[in-house]
């Protein structure tokens, strides 16, 4: 059975726990959208694993994990994540972690563009993580992006980055930020690309073969429905489709390959401090503590406020998720 796991709110609903539970009976785990601006925390025994780009199935032996074409991938960040997992005793090989050669790449100048654009918005800032996700997706949409396959060809990568930097540096200078040099960008990612090279492949035939063979595939959604670029609380959204359609376009598998969609929803939703259902009363906090213990993530980091689930909002998101 092939299953999509999506968040019905703003992310942080606990999808990682559900994916980890389903992975026990799965053969393949796929990440199809987003970047390292999202993360899943999985606790196995006494060990805590924090995943940003690597699918949760990496914690299980004999599971195949795929970073799909819909992901925007920071090669430096991914290598750091892999090294951290390896330090924790997780085995990562080209056999159990595949990276789509069509996945677009987040480069150092994307992060600076992200910061510049956020600063320029002033009071209309949207709270971006400044990890370059939006600019990378923007480059993809305007056909100025670079894919993993491009960067594995050194000469082509140098030419493409040089051309892209003309526009990027123009924007950065306009915002009073330092420009980037092609050689410096290449040098900064060269080591990471060498580390990732064995993992990069055309993942679409692999996924179609798994589907035809009747293997069980779990699609690990990132963020949540309210952050969907089309159906979320625009403009306070991410830059990709976080609903179930994003799993298909981000992996290369058609909708008919999907058997079920599981939506994960928190009773005390994250990101609710300014929502109509937010609560600031001591009695509410007492109830929360009785239900789920000391609230860390459900509360707004700035205001320390949680809220009741907004069912009238969650239900439409469930139907789209």
Model-derived features: positions:
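Non-transmembrane, aqueous-exposed alpha-helical and coiled segments at domain scale
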Residues: 1-321
């Amino acid at each position: 059975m092939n299953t999509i796991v999506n968040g019905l709110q703003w992310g942080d609903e606990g999808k990682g726990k559900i994916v980890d539970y389903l992975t026990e009976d799965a053969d393949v785990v796929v990440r199809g959208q987003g970047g390292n601006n999202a993360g899943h925390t999985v606790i196995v025994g006494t060990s805590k694993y924090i995943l940003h780009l690597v699918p949760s199935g990496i914690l299980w032996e004999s599971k195949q994990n795929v970073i799909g074409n819909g992901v925007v991938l920071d090669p430096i960040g991914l290598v750091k994540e892999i090294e951290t997992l390896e330090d924790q005793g997780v085995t990562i090989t080209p056999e159990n972690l595949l990276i789509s050669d069509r996945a677009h790449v987040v480069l150092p100048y994307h992060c600076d563009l992200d910061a510049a654009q956020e600063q320029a918005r002033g009071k209309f800032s949207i709270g971006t993580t400044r990890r370059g996700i939006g600019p990378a997706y923007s480059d993809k949409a305007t056909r100025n992006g670079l894919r993993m396959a491009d960067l594995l060809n050194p000469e082509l990568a140098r030419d493409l980055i040089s051309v892209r930097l003309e526009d990027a540096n123009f924007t950065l200078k306009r915002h009073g930020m330092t420009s980037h040099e092609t050689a410096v960008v290449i040098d900064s990612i060269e080591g990471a690309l060498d580390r990732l090279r064995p993992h990069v492949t055309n993942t679409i035939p692999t996924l179609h073969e798994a589907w035809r063979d009747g293997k069980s595939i779990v699609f690990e959604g990132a963020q949540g429905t309210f952050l969907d670029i089309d159906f979320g609380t625009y403009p306070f959204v991410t830059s990709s489709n976080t609903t179930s359609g994003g799993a298909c376009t981000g992996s290369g598998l058609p909708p008919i390959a999907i058997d079920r969609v599981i939506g994960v929803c928190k009773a005390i939703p994250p990101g609710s401090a300014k929502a109509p259902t937010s609560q600031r009363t001591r009695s509410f906090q007492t109830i929360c503590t009785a239900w789920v213990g000391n609230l860390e993530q459900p509360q707004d980091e700035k205001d320390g406020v949680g809220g009741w689930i907004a069912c009238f909002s969650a239900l439409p998101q469930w139907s789209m998720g």
